[in-house]
Amino acid sequence: IFGWDQKKKIATIFLHHLIDGNYRHGKRKIFKDNYTWAFQTIETIKKYNKINWIVKQHPSEYYYHSKFNFSTYVKKIEKEYPHIRLCPTSLNDATIKKFTNIAITSHGTSGVEFPAYGIPSICVEDSFFTGIGCSSQAKNLKHYKLLLSKAHTMTKITKQKIDRAKVFLFIYEILLKNKNL
């Protein structure tokens, strides 16, 4: 993909709609909002070229035709940072799972969905799945930057973490949404 060295891992950063759930899980611990998280993350990964980075817009960015999102910014920096690319809109999460080695999110569902497929994830803020133990949770800004700097060393997660993610998703997506139970 993108003509990248196939020996390098690929991390996908799953951006949030800028007004999407900023405070749904209480006060944010590291970044004040989705914009700050996205901007700081993109600025940080510029110097980490031992891994390739895909930046994926939240699907609702296209639905709501947001006046501002990070697409223009990422397209602008691609020339100077060939290890960073904007995810084409033609790629969906099912396709992305085939080549992504690490998923990164502030507090989104990719932080639990990708571990269900054995793909490690890095999460920053609290979410509905915080505490189930299937993702790497940043403790503070310094720890988050350390996780990003070592993303190229992350490996497939354990069967126990995969099972935790699968069981959680089954309960959350099937049992809790089934009105017949």
Where are these regions (language model features)?
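A donor-sugar binding/catalytic signature common to diverse glycosyltransferases
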Residues: P88-S136
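Short secondary-structure boundary/capping segments
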Residues: G26-I30, F68-T72, A103, I119-S121, ...
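Conserved catalytic-core segment of nucleotide-activated headgroup transferases in glycan assembly
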Residues: I1-Y73
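C-terminal amphipathic helix plus adjacent low-complexity
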Residues: I1-K7, K142-L181
